[in-house]
Amino acid sequence: MEFNRNGIHFEYPDNWAIEEDTSPDGAYGITVSAPDGAFWSLSRQPPGADSQHLIDATGDQLRGEYPDLEVYPRSDDIFGTSLSGADFNFSYLDLTNTAEVRCLNTPTACYIVFCQAEDRDWSRLHHVFKAMVTSFIRE
């Protein structure tokens, strides 16, 4: 499937559900959910937003929900575009989970990508999440 609205374009799997959200502060977000509960989200923040602050705030929010949270600073390079971020590991209901946050600053916006899945699904879905980010950056 293809999402192409509000200046944002990316591809996602046919059987995933999509939901849009606009906050009062003008931030715009999209969440794409897999049937098994895994999800990928993209949020558009104003240009010049502090990426490291957004990454840290994501970690702080997760730590508030999951005290055993492990955080690993990471970055990706896709088509020569650098994305800063972090990987997270935590337990929930006796299941281990992995999540990633990546930030992309452009002249027009700061984009935050967040994805999460149970570890038993992560090895399969990690490639889907990466393809979604790649399709977003390619545009």
How would you describe each model-predicted region?
Residues 57-108:
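Signature of long, low-cysteine stretches enriched in small and polar/charged residues
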Residues 1-4, 108, 122:
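Short, charged low-complexity linear motifs
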Residues 52, 94, 119-123:
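Loop/helix-junction capping segments adjacent to catalytic residues or to phosphate/diphosphate-binding pockets
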Residues 2-56, 60:
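Secretory pathway targeting signatures of secreted, lumenal, and periplasmic proteins
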Residues 32, 42, 86-90, 136:
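Short beta-strand element of the conserved SAM-dependent methyltransferase core
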Residues 9, 29, 84-85, 111-112:
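General beta-strand recognition
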